[in-house]
Amino acid sequence: LYVTALKHAGCQVAAKDHPQHIETMHLEPYQEKVRTWFEKVSLPETQAEEKPALEVLDLDFSYITGKPILSDIHFRINKGEMLAIVGKNGAGKSTLSNLICGFIHPDHGKILLNGSDIADKSIKERGEAIGLVMQNPNQMISKPMIFDEVALGLRVRGVPEEEVKERVYEKLKICGLYPFRNWPVSALSFGQKKRVTIASILVMNPEILILDEPTAGQ
């Protein structure tokens, strides 16, 4: 993705820039071209009455005072849109996810969900609308069987078992896991476990879906 973006910005990527991994690539020579391209690129216009599903306004955050991790972050995502955030390790991608979910709180700025400020919303209240798939599936999975893991959130909310079965099967098919529906999680590869966690969030039908390192193990 980052190499494609550089090419669209008119950058001539060379082998000496070490483009194999974004963590090792020399990006400094291209920053100005990318910034200019980003500012000029036109995005599809949305209807005036449409509210963004998620909007981040002038967001600042630091773990240590005076050492900002995120500064002046501003973006909006409309319903049905996808946004990829690419950066080196430690750039603040997971930190941004944690801010949106309410695990940590910004030093400055606002996060709006469907036009409403969610600063006073609890983690549980945000979780009703925002689904987060973490980088490491082993940090999410708590049930030994695949079906039970994907069904857990629905059962906790008291969804009837017939509906649970229907919704779980649907998401397992989407994630390519239906043939393994009665398997133990321990029999899966890391990448397959990642898909189990994606299915367990999709089954809850969140308004916003955040995938932290979505291609890990795939």
Language-model region placement:
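Helix-to-loop junction immediately C-terminal to a conserved catalytic motif
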Residues: 101
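The feature captures the beta-strand-to-loop junction immediately N-terminal to the Walker
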Residues: 86-88
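Conserved ABC transporter NBD signature motif
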Residues: 109-117, 126
